[in-house]
Amino acid sequence: MVRLILVTIITCMLCVPSTFARSFVVPLQANGTVHHIDKDSIQLAGQSSTMRMVKATMAVKSPKYEDIAYITYFYKYDLINRTIQKKPIILYMGTKMPYTYNSPYLDVSVVGSVDYIYANYAYYKEFGSYFSQDMIDRYGSTDLSTNK
């Protein structure tokens, strides 16, 4: 009986945090794919007088497949030219073996695109303000997430 209670407590301790710990941004849809960003994964990855870098993990789910891919992006913010670049690093697809995908940096320049909004959101969560003026004009200081 004691073992059963102990197993139940340990199971709850392992399952409950993994179920409720992650909180996501409002889902955005682009090209038939639903994206979410894991707020808990956003963290500073580096900074200098001319650049800031933020790491964020995204869940990408296609309506065609049951698998969810988890992609870790490094967003590089050029403080002088006011440009954003992204670099996808790791892709996990469902229960398959993870593999590393090391891409070159890609420009995030389409205003209003999913990548643009997420890059600005990651910056907002780390530094308290949006990186791009049009995001400030559009959202003010409003948090885009569903869970404030």
Regions found by a protein language model. Give the residues of each.
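Short amphipathic alpha-helical segments that mediate assembly, nucleic-acid/protein binding
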Residues: L6-V7, S132
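Bacterial N-terminal signal peptides
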Residues: V7-C15
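N-terminal secretory-pathway/extracellular module detecting exported/lumenal segments
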Residues: T19-K148
